[in-house]
UniProtKB/Swiss-Prot annotation:
Origin organism lineage: Eukaryota, Metazoa, Ecdysozoa, Arthropoda, Chelicerata
Organism of derivation: Cyriopagopus hainanus (Chinese bird spider)
Compartments, record wording: Secreted
Disulfide pairings: 75-90, 82-95, 89-110
Family as reported in the entry's similarity comment: Belongs to the neurotoxin 14 (magi-1) family. 01 (HNTX-16) subfamily.
This protein's name: U11-theraphotoxin-Hhn1a
Maturation propeptide residues: 22-74
GO cellular component, one term: extracellular region
Tissue and organ expression note: Expressed by the venom gland.
Length: 113
């Protein structure tokens, strides 16, 4: 019974001492990995930042090229009443007095050219 206790005690002491050494090694290994991971994250962050800056530059370039006055304002679709003095018909449509079916409305409508 004594030999079993001594053997168990010896195995226990060896396990604890080797375990602590492994723990220190693991701690150092984890520290190295986190340092490598941080450098990788920094690299990835810089790469992403460069891509975002390029995208932003392209968007701003397109914005400056496009004039706000060149955009079509809200327009009236086909078959919708319009004002003969201020026609706002969409492109490809003209503000005309209706023929036949709409003459009793006494109004102008947007029709295709």
């Amino acid at each position: 019974m004594n030999t079993v206790r001594v053997t168990f005690l010896l195995v226990f002491v060896l396990a604890v001492s080797l375990g602590q050494a492994d723990k220190d090694e693991n701690r150092m290994e984890m520290q190295e990995k986190t340092e490598q991971g941080e450098s990788y994250l920094d690299f990835a962050e810089n790469l992403l930042l460069q891509k975002l800056e390029e995208l932003e530059a392209k968007l701003l370039e397109e914005d400056s090229e496009e004039s706000r006055n060149s955009r079509q304002k809200r327009c009236i679709g086909e078959g919708v009443p319009c004002d003969e003095n201020d026609p706002r018909c969409c492109s490809g449509l003209v503000c005309l007095k209706p023929t036949l079916h709409g003459i009793w409305y006494k109004s102008y409508y947007c029709y295709k050219k």
